[in-house]
Amino acid sequence: IRELVLHHVGGYLKIAPEHTEQGPLSKMMKPGIGTYDRFRQMFEQFSREAGKEQFLIPYFIAAHPGTTDEDMLNLALWLKKSGFRADQVQAFYPSPMATATAMYHTGLNPLKGIHRDQRGEKVDTVKGERRRRLHKAFLRYHDPNNWPLLRETLKRMGRADLIGNGKHHLIPAFQPRTDGSYSSPRRAHSTSSPLKGGLLTRHTGLPPCGSPQEKKESKQWGDRRKGKSA
């Protein structure tokens, strides 16, 4: 990590903890959020020792198979405690040849073996517009447009204690006038450079749409297709 910090980071480093809860993380075969915390501590320590001001930009995902509403609530609480605010939000979408896609369509965990009886491990899949919108709303807990849905959900979950105007509350009790707008996750990020405390979300392993990396890979793909046609 010291080598990475000293010679291979240009101010920002993107890293993908994906989630804080074991439900979705186990389906992704990802380590727990404690691994990210330890990496962050070493990253910040070595950056200070090198006299550099560098930041981690974490990726998180909404609506991945194996994610419950409680998981998203816990992620939102962790994000607020850590001082992170998502700019654009993208949710999981099934894509070909992905293990998560098999989970999405079957409701079973192929990592544990597929069985139609009680031996099969059932996987909670996030389907339906309202529930998918809810999981996105938890990632953007700071957006006033999401507060009505989050208030309703928190009351249903028996967590009305998280509604209020204190620092320990997730969302305020009052509702300001909003236009109800939502930024499309397919648009480029609204800032040219990530801000401290910012984070990114994704639905696949692809780079953010419109990013320099995405444009570069798209050009390389186009060049390969032209070469094959020739």
Regions found by a protein language model. Name each.
Residues V9-G10, F84, R159:
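A structural motif
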Residues I1-K80:
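Conserved non-cysteine loop/helix-boundary elements of the Radical SAM core domain that shape
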Residues L56-A63, A91-A98, L170-I171:
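A glycine-rich phosphate-binding loop feature that marks nucleotide/adenosyl-phosphate handling sites
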Residues R116, P172-A230:
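Acidic, low-complexity intrinsically disordered tails
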Residues K52-I57, R85-A91, L162-I163:
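Acidic/polar loop patches that form or flank catalytic/metal-binding clefts of enzymes
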Residues M72-A86, Q90-N145, L154-K155:
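C-terminal low-complexity, glycine/proline- and small-hydrophobic-enriched intrinsically disordered tails
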Residues A137-G180:
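Amphipathic alpha-helical packing elements
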